[in-house]
Amino acid sequence: MAAGLDSWNSTINGTWEGDELGYKCRFNEDFKYVLLPVSYGVVCVLGLCLNVVALYIFLCRLKTWNASTTYMFHLAVSDSLYAASLPLLVYYYAQGDHWPFSTVLCKLVRFLFYTNLYCSILFLTCISVHRCLGVLRPLHSLSWGHARYARRVAAVVWVLVLACQAPVLYFVTTSVRGTRITCHDTSARELFSHFVAYSSVMLGLLFAVPFSIILVCYVLMARRLLKPAYGTTGLPRAKRKSVRTIALVLAVFALCFLPFHVTRTLYYSFRSLDLSCHTLNAINMAYKITRPLASANSCLDPVLYFLAGQRLVRFARDAKPATEPTPSPQARRKLGLHRPNRTDTVRKDLSISSDDSRRTESTPAGSETKDIRL
């Protein structure tokens, strides 16, 4: 994402000073030009490699898909698209907030960030709901868990997110500041109030609601799974796997999405209040630090691919055809085995021919005719 105070006037050395509301705060953001290029570079390499491998497994190794694998496939597609766009941001921040590319590319990079962010949230929500239904309504989930239903849900998710994030292409723009071109992640100054209202709606619709659903799923599953079936002790393996999956989803939310949305909301709110420069500097720094965490979900999502299903966990073993080990000559002699030679083959053929001749001579003609009629 671009600099947090993008609508403020920038100085040449990367600090920021007041806006139209009369603030005269200057923030030293030198740390950003090291933190963001390094973190985005790591996310780009790891995220792209892990998700490309995951896509290969989904497309080339899995023979049958269920609802979970369908959602994970679309999650990997979204993460791969985002990771592929990060080299442009790495260059942008390494150059000190200078965007030498076109405005269209600036809009596309910001659009991919928010699209990946909310696609990840919604697909993780779908995985959690699917697991929860498998625990609470195992019989009904047999029909709801088909891949064809998951494909329809995934299509709805893509359409919903693309439609909701389309305004980003309108708000995001570039501006010339001295000798540099800034690629804003919010909007121009005159549209900022509209952008804040739009972001608030997206916060509630695409983050608060899914996060609440995941929390409800986790609570319901925990209550059910803490009660073992009558006459049994412990939890079945399938139920333990469901709990691990949703617990991992909650960890991803807690680490990546929650800090980002909290600090961004505070940042947008504080910009319209007459607060001290110290307070604004603190929230500005927190907002910058949480942006790499929001991007890190592209690397953490593939962990789900290897923990959620048995086929994905065993993909490395299934990738090569199973072969039986060839016994050594000593082992063959111990077991009474030996490699057949030409003499053994001739003897075996003669024995089979002799047995066939004896069976033919002992079979009555009537029996042969009867067998043919049957």
Swiss-Prot record:
GO terms for cellular component: apical plasma membrane; basolateral plasma membrane; early endosome; glutamatergic synapse; plasma membrane; presynaptic active zone membrane. It comes from the Eukaryota. Residues 318-374 are annotated as: Disordered. Residues 341-361 have a biased composition (Basic and acidic residues). Keywords: Cell membrane, Disulfide bond, G-protein coupled receptor, Glycoprotein, Membrane, Receptor, Transducer, Transmembrane, Transmembrane helix. Residues 60-70, 130-152, 221-245, 309-374 are cytoplasmic. Residues 331-340 have a biased composition (Basic residues). It holds the Pfam family 7tm_1. Glycans are attached at N9, N13. Gene3D superfamilies: Rhodopsin 7-helix transmembrane proteins (1.20.1070.10). The chain crosses the membrane at residues 33-59, 71-93, 111-129, 153-172, 195-220, 246-268, 287-308. Coiled coil: none annotated. It is found in: Cell membrane. Its main location: membrane. One of its GO terms (molecular function) is A1 adenosine receptor binding. The keyword Disulfide bond applies. Belongs to the G-protein coupled receptor 1 family. PANTHER family: P2Y PURINOCEPTOR 2, PURINOCEPTOR-RELATED G-PROTEIN COUPLED RECEPTOR. This is P2Y purinoceptor 2. It comes from Rattus norvegicus.
